[in-house]
Design a protein with these regions (language model features):
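A short alpha-helical cap/connector motif
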Residues: 1-104, 108-128, 132-213
């Protein structure tokens, strides 16, 4: 089973990796994403760039650096504010980190994900945000329009109209929830047309169950 603990993004992320060919930016290193991406791109010419602001945490992964994997330290604290989030964007700009087909946002603090989302919205083909419910619940990205609770496990529906053209919020099956919120994963694109995005969503939904076997 590919999904363990808080790695609830993995089914959707893995299917996106399988259906894209370009480079990947990972904001926030972790066992649930870094190793999976490396395994998938092994033997290809795809490049993974991993960014992390926690130097101690980053040190757990720096030994992985190779021709296909670049790891960089973002000089930013963990204060959850726009100023901190913008330091991530400043690092990206200063290091000319461009040309990513897939951007995965799982960094800390929350506003680092928001600022990187804004920056890559019209640059990356597919953006994936883990723990996405935090953002509409706090009116940071879109808004929450419906909450459904089953056995103290909550799913939300969100409205991102005017924020991003194509989006889908994915939840694990209830029995694979971690805690009360899932957590959910947003897959979105401002670059793909509706037909292409809907095809990607159908592929993910068709194969999702296989990750829980």
């Amino acid at each position: 089973m590919l999904v363990q603990g808080f790695y609830t993004h993995r089914p959707y992320f893995k299917e996106i990796l399988k259906n894209t060919t370009g480079n990947i930016l990972e904001c926030g290193c972790g066992e649930g994403s870094t190793m999976m991406i490396r395994e998938h791109i092994r033997g290809t010419d795809r490049i993974l760039v991993s960014l992390e602001s926690n130097l101690e945490w980053l040190s757990k992964y720096t030994h992985l650096a190779d021709a296909n994997h670049v790891l960089q330290h973002v000089i930013a604290d963990n204060e959850d504010c726009v100023k901190t989030g913008n330091k991530w964007v400043e690092h990206i700009e200063a290091n000319q980190l461009t040309n990513f087909e897939v951007v995965f946002l799982d960094s800390s603090p929350w506003m680092s994900r928001k600022c990187c989302f804004d920056y890559f919205l019209d640059k990356a083909k597919v953006i994936i945000i883990h723990d996405f419910d935090y953002f509409p619940n706090n009116n940071i990205i879109g808004k929450t329009i419906l909450r459904t609770c089953v056995d103290n496990k909550e799913k939300i529906e969100c409205d991102l109209t005017g924020v991003v053209k194509n989006y889908k919020l994915f939840y694990p099956p209830y029995k694979h929830f971690v805690g009360t919120t899932g957590p959910p994963t947003l897959v979105c694109s401002n670059i793909m047309d509706h037909e292409e995005f809907d095809t990607l969503v159908r592929i993910i939904q068709t194969n999702e169950a296989s990750y829980y076997v």
